[in-house]
């Protein structure tokens, strides 16, 4: 196998803080090279430098033997380098077809090539739909197709399966293997060890801006990889200090009630029909299903972002079906959205402002309180930051997710709806978030958790509701929650 790209001694700083410290990295043709690391380790920054999106402070890139001090995005594309970002970046008002073919040369019948790619992926994308209507999983597939249509020799996949269902993941893996046979080199950034072992012949682990482990995947067991990412052994539970810092700010809930926090009767809306459920204080209810089953649409309707077409919603025995989003929020219904960069965070605002954005205090107490709130969640969640005024866009994906979680908790929820809360989050941070959800529920907050990673529900959810084509196909109590049963119900079968 020939060397496609080599990075030598790459250094990079943001605001005087080193994020890459002398990185060396090599990718061969036909190789899947996995890149692991905790949140803020520098993985995405390194890949953005290779793709020409960021400029290194020092170091050199060699692409098929040609040296470059830096690359520009257009130059990287011409060299066959394509980055599929963790957060899809599509033109929302263009169609799927227009997004995929944007600025692609007209020769070689692109429409036919696109049809062939879709068939190879067994992908059911509606090419005439507006990109803004797609769920995150479908947006991810559009990004991947963009790269494939540009005959990428070097394909960088940043957490490509984070929001894909098992079936979509397996189809993607088949396409990756086909690309390997064509000599395409693939950098596969993931936190999912089974996927890395299934796909990657080589693995590199980054920590604090440096490569701390690299070699053939078979050389290392899971413990070695996790230890390299997180050098300090972490308990699965939160420490007493963290629990203290995570105590919710208000006193809205002190004890469980004998009536449900949320009651929904025959609710119909965009993407779902006749849904009924009850969630009680202190209960964690999982909402499983395939992408397109209507889970996110249901959550957004509960929050008031989408209109209802029928049915009723009660929050603590108060009907809220006609309430605005702001009124529902004031009553304690808080929603953590699926796409943190588009729907969740104010990326160009400071961390302190993002953290209290849902319950802004009066101006005279604002700044002092914001600093105290950021300090609380910095300690409790381990948010990696330099200072409260740091712009959210400069944080790693996992730390952005923690800021969004902090904002939701600071809003003093009665019902917390979390949509894909661990998307793009590393192994140790996932454990923190799971324990955080348990800690919140222990304070008698009702939690509705949506996840495409079905392995998250056993041991976490008190029960799991499964959706199929906009309807509930079944409910599993804690003792019956298993991957096989959830998958069977998600495909419309029996558990």
Curated annotation (Swiss-Prot):
Binding residues for ATP: 37-44
Thylakoid as UniProt keyword: no
Enzyme class name: translocase
Main location, first listed in the record: membrane
Annotated InterPro entries: AAA+_ATPase, ABC_carbohydrate_import_ATPase, ABC_transporter-like_ATP-bd, ABC_transporter-like_CS, P-loop_NTPase
PROSITE patterns the record matches: ABC_TRANSPORTER_1, ABC_TRANSPORTER_2
ATP-binding as UniProt keyword: yes
Enzymatic reactions: ATP + H2O + (2R,4S)-2-methyl-2,3,3,4-tetrahydroxytetrahydrofuran-[AI-2-binding protein]Side 1 = ADP + phosphate + (2R,4S)-2-methyl-2,3,3,4-tetrahydroxytetrahydrofuranSide 2 + [AI-2-binding protein]Side 1
Molecular function GO terms recorded: ATP binding; ATP hydrolysis activity
A Pfam cross-reference name: ABC_tran
Membrane topology: Peripheral membrane protein
Enzyme Commission identifier(s): 7.6.2.13
Record keywords: ATP-binding, Cell inner membrane, Cell membrane, Membrane, Nucleotide-binding, Repeat, Translocase, Transport
One GO CC term, this protein: plasma membrane
Superkingdom as given in the UniProt entry: Bacteria
Sequence ranges assigned to domain ABC transporter in this UniProt record: 5-233, 256-494
Location(s) in or outside the cell: Cell inner membrane
Function, in words: Part of the ABC transporter complex LsrABCD involved in autoinducer 2 (AI-2) import. Responsible for energy coupling to the transport system.
Family: Belongs to the ABC transporter superfamily. AI-2 autoinducer porter (TC 3.A.1.2.8) family.
UniProt-listed PANTHER family: AUTOINDUCER 2 IMPORT ATP-BINDING PROTEIN LSRA, CARBOHYDRATE TRANSPORT ATP-BINDING PROTEIN MG119-RELATED
Subunit structure: The complex is composed of two ATP-binding proteins (LsrA), two transmembrane proteins (LsrC and LsrD) and a solute-binding protein (LsrB).
Protein name per UniProt: Autoinducer 2 import ATP-binding protein LsrA
